[in-house]
């Protein structure tokens, strides 16, 4: 069993309090013969830490390998400064954007919502376009927005629309 988390407690155990109702858990039954490869097909997880239980033996650092998944966008911009802190902030911004590109711009890859909030998409759009070729991505997203727009012009809070009002 793999359980994912962004935080750990002081004793090193994973802290999943910020995940709300999200299970962020995968169960895989080993065949037990040589190297095995498995990937979830209908979900993804945003995480910094992973807890592995039920593994036969002592896992090493090479026991698990993560795969980064996101909508394919090409890097078009770059940033470099003489200040290492600014360079690190830029790396964090790029990773944050990529981990939230899953056909729509999502708000968080780790919790239970992973929804395309229009406000979040709006405030990150300029940054995204400075770093990546977002033309095809936003063209598709605008079509999605148009699909949920009411006859009177009203919009939902999220696209695609899941719950709530216009």
What role is predicted for each listed range?
Residues 117-123, 130:
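An alpha-helical repeat/solenoid feature that recognizes helix-turn-helix modules
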Residues 84, 125-128:
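Acidic, His- and aromatic-enriched active-site or binding-groove loops in soluble protein domains
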Residues 1-111, 119-120, 134-139, 145, ...:
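Extracellular/oxidizing-compartment recognition motifs
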